Amino acid sequence: MKVRASVKRVCRNCKIVKRRGTVRVICTEARHKQRQG
């Protein structure tokens, strides 16, 4: 899980999701997981 100021899609499988006020990226590739913080 990467924590970044700006989250971006890395590949076409990445989805940007807002959960409990935080922006997250979920993907089938585990290395692409990010959250904004």
Curated annotation (Swiss-Prot):
Record-level GO cellular component terms: cytoplasm; ribonucleoprotein complex; ribosome
GO biological-process terms attached to the record: translation
GO terms of molecular function: structural constituent of ribosome
InterPro entries for this protein: Ribosomal_bL36 (IPR000473), Ribosomal_bL36_sp (IPR035977)
Alphabetically ordered keywords of this record: Ribonucleoprotein, Ribosomal protein
Cross-referenced Pfam families: Ribosomal_L36
SUPFAM superfamilies in the cross-refs: Ribosomal protein L36
PANTHER family to which the protein is assigned, alphabetical: 50S RIBOSOMAL PROTEIN L36, CHLOROPLASTIC (PTHR42888), LARGE RIBOSOMAL SUBUNIT PROTEIN BL36C (PTHR42888:SF1)
Similarity comment: Belongs to the bacterial ribosomal protein bL36 family.
Protein name, per record: Large ribosomal subunit protein bL36
Species of origin: Halorhodospira halophila (strain DSM 244 / SL1)
Gene that encodes the chain: rpmJ
